[in-house]
Structures are given as structure tokens and as C-alpha cells.
Amino acid sequence: MDSYKKVLATGKQVAFVIKKGALTFDEKISYKNSFTMRREDVLRKIIDVAAQDFIIATTGKTGRELFELREANGQNHAHDFLTVGSMGHCSSIALGLALNHPEKTFWCVDGDGALIMHMGALAVIGAAKPQNLIHVVINNGAHESVGGMPTAAANIDLTGIARACGYPEVFKATNFDELENYLQLAKAAKKLTFIEVECAIGSRKDLGRPTTTPAENKLKFMEALNDSQI
């Protein structure tokens, strides 16, 4: 570790290549918040209300949990687009889909860290106002998929920002009764809707990863999207 400082001092760059398993987590640092809803349970509610609508999920554990919930329900994944490795882009992808397929309804399931990374998308979405897009932000105030470090979400008003960007319907769910109500309202409203969901930090220890490739996911999603029977 000391040797790289000498290299940097010469104006050169340094890259570390670390083998999987070389680093361990001693659990001395624990990130928590005061929220009670689990993300996986929130996703389960969204799946129930969305039914045959299309879901665009942000990168990380959100997409992984969505995939496993579909597996547990015996459902296929054709109506889900998993934004693997493209943090912050799911809202823009959802906007493009909503504008090009006004006859279908799209649910963008975002995260607070991802939203902040590309917050400019809110202004573009708010200006376009697609009536068939529901933007759900699961806010746990953390970059949980990469260790749980805090985001800036605790210091900003996400619903206020969405409202200022032109979202006509804005809600904030702090418990499951509110969540169920707001999801149903969004489904029926036929208006661009923003829902912030306060969520606890944490996931199952045995949480797996998608067993299909991103390319396979994309092709199945495109087939379902263009199926005239859907």
C-alpha cells in the first residue's frame, strides 16, 4: 500500500486488482435507520398492484429481490427490466418506454442513491408528464448494495423535489397501509405519479442473483412489450 504513493507522486495512475474473497467484513460498522418496511415486502406489494404492467427496476438488490419474488410466485420475468450495472438510469429508461408505448403502464422502481445520481431525469420526466408512468423511490438512505454507506437522501426533500419538477401526483409512504393506498391511487389515476417509500436497511442473507443474463432479460422484455395480446 505504501508503494503506490510513490507512483502517484510521479503523476502516474494506480489500479488495484483484488481477487474475490480477499476482503472480509468484520461487521464492526452497522448502518441502520428508523424505518420499518422491508424492501422485499415493498416489492411484493408493487408486484401485486402492478399485475400485468411493466416494471423497470434499479440496479443492485432491488432487481435481485424482484427476480427472486417472481421465481417464488411462479411468474416469468418478461414484464421486468432489470437495470443491471446502470445506476441512476432506470427512470430515463422508464420514461422512454412510457412515451413510446402510451397504451401500457410502466412502474419505475428506483432507489434513493440512484435517483440522486441522475436527479436531472426528474426534471425531464416532470416536463414530459407521461400519464402511464408511476415512479416509486424506495428510500432507505443508503447505498445498501455496495455496503450500506449513507446517501444524501436524509438531508433533502425528495417529494418536494419531484413536485417542483412537475410531477402532478406526489405521495410519501411511511407504512404498509399508506403504501397500499398510494399504489392503488397511482394505478387508478392515469397520471404521472411519484411515490417515496421509507424503507429499512437490510436484505436476506441468502439473497441470490438473476439466473438469466442481461441480454436474455432484454430480449424477453422486448418480446412482451411488443406482444399485441398484452
Segments and roles (model prediction):
Residues 18-24, 59-63, 140-142, 198-203:
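Glycine-rich beta-alpha junction loops
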Residues 16-22, 26-58:
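Active-site pocket-lining segments that scaffold enzyme catalytic pockets across diverse folds
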Residues 54-73:
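Catalytic donor nucleotide-activated moiety binding site of glycosyltransferases and closely related
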Residues 1-6, 36-45, 49, 68-229:
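Thiamine diphosphate
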Residues 1-17, 21-22:
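Extended, hydrophobic interaction surfaces within ordered domains
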